[in-house]
Amino acid sequence: MTKISVGLQLVTRDSREKLNNIVIKSSLRLNRSNPNISELCFLKTCHLCNKQLHQDKDVYMYRGDLGFCSRECRESQMLIDDRKELEASTKMMLASYRRCNNGAGKSESRNLFDDLRRRRQLFIVP
């Protein structure tokens, strides 16, 4: 019967041995004398209202690297982005409809506009 070891195992070797399968590279350093202004200001101000962000207060993040001073600012930016996406998809849908419209009846166009109206109702803030 063969003995099989499972788990972590400490392997020691003499460091004076030259192993052909080991490559040692130093890390790369980018020598940039002028960093972007966005790099210098990362999480310094709210992305929406430009209020200064403080280290002792909560920062509300959105899409990975956008910081906001409050939930309201973050949610407003989310609504703005959703509206932009809706407008872009609406334009694409209308362009597609116009290309594919081969004498289609009024009922199809009415269904399309009713669908768009319903989608826009989702973004109306009371």
Curated annotation (Swiss-Prot):
Zinc fingers (FLZ-type), renumbered ranges: 41-85
Cystine residue pairs: none
Gene (name only): FLZ17
Compartments (UniProt record): Nucleus; Cytoplasm
Keywords, in A-Z order: Cytoplasm, Metal-binding, Nucleus, Zinc, Zinc-finger
Induction line: Up-regulated in response to prolonged energy depletion. Down-regulated by glucose, sucrose and mannose. Induced by NaCl and abscissic acid (ABA). Induced by cytokinin.
UniProt-listed GO biological process terms: response to abscisic acid; response to cytokine; response to glucose; response to mannose; response to salt; response to starvation; response to sucrose
GO molecular function: zinc ion binding
A cellular component term, taken from the record's GO annotations: cytoplasm
Secretion signal span: none
Keyword Cell inner membrane attached: no
Function: May act as an adapter to facilitate the interaction of SnRK1 complex with effector proteins, conferring tissue- and stimulus-type specific differences in the SnRK1 regulation pathway.
The organism's place on the tree of life at top rank: Eukaryota
Protein name: FCS-Like Zinc finger 17
UniProt key word Nucleus: yes
